Each structure stands twice: as C-alpha cells, then as structure tokens.
C-alpha cells in the first residue's frame, strides 16, 4: 500500500516472522530484575484447596495477603482490609497468588522506573515497560503462568511487547475494578499477561470472567448489558472457534506509519500483515485521522482524573503526616504529599490540576473530551460491527454509518480497497504495540517525560475508545550483543468483540509458533 504516494511495503511475499522462543533472550549472567514488591504464598478464604495455576498481582490491585503500596512512599506500609474482586475471582478459578509486582508509582509511567522500590529490568536487561513492568517480567521469567496488570493508556500491552509475552486489555467495563487503586477512572482497565493466549482466553471466556458483573464497581457493565452486547458477537458460548481467515478483514491505519517508527518494528508489522494475507485474510488501509490528537488528549484527561483521585492522600486517611503538619500556620497535607509522592506523580497532579482550573478548563479538558469522542467515532466508522453502546445514527461530528474516511484515492491500484473515498469496513485493526524496541535501562532512565509519552502513541487510542486490544510478541533480529529483542504486534477489536479477538489471537499465535510462514 501507499502512504502519501510511497509504498509502505505491507503486501510482501513469504514472511519469516516467528513467535519468540522464551529461552533464547535470557542473558548469560543473572540480572537483578526487581520485579516483585512482595513475594510469598498465603492462603485466602477464596482460594480453593487445590490451586491449579500461579498468578502475580500488580501492586496497585488490593490483596489481603500482601501490602498494596502502588510503588509509592505514601502507601509504603499500607495493607488493604479487603481483596480486589478480580483477585478473588481468579482464586475461585484455581489461582494461587505468589506475590505483588513492581510498577510505576500509581501506574504513571512507561518504563517501570518511577517506583519507590526502584526500577524494574527485563530478563534481557532492558526496560520492562510500564506501568505493569513487574507483572510482565514475572511472566517472561517463567515465575508465574498469569499476571494481573492495569492498562490505562497501554500499561499492559507495552510491557508485554518489551518482554516478549502476551498482554490483553479487555473492553472497558468487562473486568471489575473494585479493589484497584484508581489512576484515571474512565480509562483504567484490569488486564492479563501470560505466555499463552489460550490461558487468557480460558479465563476471560471459558471461565466466564466476561459475564461477571460487580455491584461494587460503578464502571462494571450490568448483567443485562453484557448479555445484550454479547448477543451480537461470536465466541462467547463455548470453546475457541476455528478461525476462517478468508472471511476476515484487517485494517492497517495509515496514521500509524509515523516517522518515529523503528525500521525493525515496521518490518515486523509488514511481515505479520503479509502473513495474514498468505492465510487468506484481506488486509486493507484505513484512516483514523483523530488518532494524531489522541496522545495529547490522553495526557490532559488522565492527569486531570489523577489529580482528583490522589487528593485523598493527605496524611490523615492515607500516608504519614510530616513534622511541618504540627505547625499552626502549616498546611496539613503539604509535608505528607511532598515526601510521599515521587516526581512523576507530582508532575501529573500539577498538570491535571491546571487543566481543570477555570482558566484552562475550556481550552484543555473540554477539548480533550471532544477529541476522545472523535477517536471513538473513527473506530466505529471503520469497524464492520457496530458499537453496542453507541447510537448508530449519524451525529453532528459525522460518526454515523454515512461518514466517509479520508480520501485514499491516491493509493496504488493494487491495494485491495473497493471504495477509496468511502469507509473501509474491517473486523480488526493491526498495528505495532510500540514504535521502538525496548530501550536499555540506562536509556529509559535518561528519557524525558515527553520522550516516554511517545511510547504510548499506538496504545492510547484503543484506551480512549474503551476497546479490547491484545499485544502478541514476534522475534526481531538480535542486537549487537546477541540478545534477542521483541516486537509487539497489536490487534484491536470493536467494543465487546473480546471473544472473537482472542480466538483470532490464538490462531495467529499458533501459526507464528509453528513457524509456518
């Protein structure tokens, strides 16, 4: 296909992309990974007598057997009086929780380096990704079968890509957030990491997590709404369905072919697209024009919500008051927050508070909400399936079925798109998970906040729209030190199309694993 008159090279011949071999990337010398905050087995009332698989829990998800610190000094000694719903649900399905994992403080970061417990390193000695870096490393190192993380703007998918594992973010409202320490309520989503897509599918679909409404979580979709959403979808009634590639169409978003995209990542993207074509799937270009503004909107909305959520950490309800709090003229919470929060959290609180101020609300927060609606509209326009939570009628913004995508008439005649001036309708969207491979830990520590934010450019749009997305690992060429590096390939589905998305991921991962490409 072409981008601005130049061929991207996605329509290749035979490809050589393959799923990573998890033993090949481990360094010869042991690296201090620092991925667990608390480790140890403890029984729970919800735990069955015979546990069947091991789970690590991100340290911003409440457990009673381990402290819940959110990698912050302000919660250093905090232990939750109750257990998160999703942890209890996994225990009842045979999980044994072996510990809690390190993260960026309160989930705010890209490399799991903003932690009161110190930075996390991947088994390859590189950035573990963030903010669920500890969970991804626990899976990559083979210490657990499944790990829980949270995904606000890519915090499950990015670590999965950096560590060569599978990372799944379900549709917003599917898995309960009760017991999850909030960063941004309208974006936070509990996600799963594992080496096997099948394991994730078994839990979400086979074990029925998708159907579990939680009265304690106001963002949990009601039981009636779940059934209504599932009624227009396939894959929720039984075992994984056999995927018929010939009937599927994958969209390649033109706007994702950015200048900053690493050539090795682009090559992996091209090869997976070519592989899908060789299997019989249709691969076409699509336009998601508002995704260019998605990252900026996210970094207005998420900090704004965070500034409100973190207001409770005042040294009275949470945290320890500092000595200055005893002064009559002092501010009670100033010392507690100053000593308890790290630099990145303080930065985002200030940014969020400003965007909610009277002088900035209209220019920043309100505009960011408009961009968010446009991003969702872009996805709804290109997906074959309708969004069950959205009115299908056209709106003033032009989201409806009659809306047209950007003019693609200059694309090469060989590109299989029937109407290059109308909306291309696809089953799934295929993109890289991250624009670059995992940087070294030193490179990650030296990145500015702006540099780190750009790593989320491909993951944020699905988060803003509340869509399910999965990151699958593929091998890239070895670096100069002979250490294997991974590319994450992301597949995005329409809202509540999680079961079919997981079926496709299982099938694609199986082909990659067999090397039949």
Curated annotation (Swiss-Prot):
Active-site annotation: 58, 131, 155
GO biological processes: glutaminyl-tRNAGln biosynthesis via transamidation; mitochondrial translation
Region annotated Disordered, chain positions: 106-132
Gene3D superfamilies named among the record's database cross-references: Amidase signature (AS) domain (3.90.1300.10)
UniProt protein name: Glutamyl-tRNA(Gln) amidotransferase subunit A, mitochondrial
Family to which this protein belongs: Belongs to the amidase family. GatA subfamily.
Keyword Membrane: no
PROSITE patterns in UniProt: AMIDASES
EC number: 6.3.5.7
The entry's keywords: ATP-binding, Ligase, Mitochondrion, Nucleotide-binding, Protein biosynthesis
InterPro entries according to UniProt: Amidase, Amidase_CS, Amidase_dom, AS_sf, GatA
Superkingdom per UniProt: Eukaryota
GO cellular component term of the entry, any: mitochondrion
Assembly notes: Subunit of the heterotrimeric GatCAB amidotransferase (AdT) complex, composed of A, B and C subunits.
Role summary: Allows the formation of correctly charged Gln-tRNA(Gln) through the transamidation of misacylated Glu-tRNA(Gln) in the mitochondria. The reaction takes place in the presence of glutamine and ATP through an activated gamma-phospho-Glu-tRNA(Gln).
GO MF assignments: ATP binding; glutaminyl-tRNA synthase (glutamine-hydrolyzing) activity
Broad enzyme group: ligase
Lineage: Eukaryota, Fungi, Dikarya, Ascomycota, Pezizomycotina
């Amino acid at each position: 296909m072409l981008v601005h008159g130049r061929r991207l090279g996605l329509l290749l011949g035979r490809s050589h992309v393959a799923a990573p071999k998890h033993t090949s990337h481990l360094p010869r010398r042991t690296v201090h990974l620092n991925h667990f905050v608390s480790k140890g087995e403890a029984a729970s009332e919800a735990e069955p007598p015979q546990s069947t698989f091991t789970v690590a829990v991100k340290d911003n998800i409440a457990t009673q057997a381990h402290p819940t610190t959110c990698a912050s000094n302000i919660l250093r000694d905090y232990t939750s009086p109750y257990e998160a719903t999703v942890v209890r649900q996994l225990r009842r399905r045979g999980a044994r929780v072996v510990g809690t994992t390190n993260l960026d403080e309160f989930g705010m970061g890209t490399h799991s380096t903003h932690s009161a417990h110190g930075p996390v390193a991947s088994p390859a000695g590189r950035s573990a990704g963030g903010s669920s870096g500890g969970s991804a490393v626990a899976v990559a190192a083979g210490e657990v079968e499944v790990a829980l993380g949270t995904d606000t703007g890519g915090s499950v998918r990015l670590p999965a890509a950096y560590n060569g594992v599978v990372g799944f973010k379900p549709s917003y409202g599917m898995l309960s957030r009760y017991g999850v320490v909030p960063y941004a309520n309208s974006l936070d989503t509990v996600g799963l990491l594992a080496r096997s897509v099948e394991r994730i599918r078994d839990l979400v679909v086979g074990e029925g997590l998708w159907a579990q409404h939680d009265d304690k979580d106001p963002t949990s979709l009601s039981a009636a709404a779940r059934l209504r959403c599932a009624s227009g979808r396939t894959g929720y009634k039984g075992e994984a369905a056999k995927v018929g590639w010939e009937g599927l169409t994958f969209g390649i978003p033109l706007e994702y072919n950015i200048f900053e995209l690493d050539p090795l990542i682009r090559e992996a993207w091209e090869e997976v697209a070519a592989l899908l074509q060789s299997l019989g799937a249709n691969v076409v270009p699509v336009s998601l024009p508002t995704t260019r503004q998605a990252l900026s909107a996210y970094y207005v909305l998420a900090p704004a919500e965070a500034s409100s959520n973190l207001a409770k950490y005042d040294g009275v309800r949470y945290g320890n008051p500092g000595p200055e709090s005893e002064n009559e003229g002092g501010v009670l919470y100033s010392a507690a927050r100053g000593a308890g929060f790290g630099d990145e959290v303080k930065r985002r609180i200030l940014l969020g508070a400003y965007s909610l101020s009277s002088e900035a609300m209209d220019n920043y927060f309100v505009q960011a909400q408009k961009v968010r609606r446009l991003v969702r509209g872009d996805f709804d326009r290109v997906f074959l399936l309708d969004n069950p939570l959205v009115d299908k009628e056209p709106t003033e913004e032009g989201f409806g079925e009659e809306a047209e995508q950007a003019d693609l008439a200059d694309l090469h005649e060989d590109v299989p798109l029937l109407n290059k001036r109308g909306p291309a309708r696809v089953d799934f969207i295929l993109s890289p998970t991250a624009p670059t491979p995992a940087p070294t830990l030193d490179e990650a520590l030296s990145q500015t906040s702006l540099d780190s934010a750009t790593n989320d450019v491909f993951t944020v749009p699905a988060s803003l729209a509340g869509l399910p997305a999965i990151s699958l690992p593929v091998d890239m060429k070895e670096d100069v030190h002979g250490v294997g590096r991974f590319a994450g390939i992301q597949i995005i589905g329409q809202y509540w199309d999680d079961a079919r998305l997981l079926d496709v991921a299982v099938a694609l991962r199986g082909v990659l694993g067999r090397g039949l490409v």
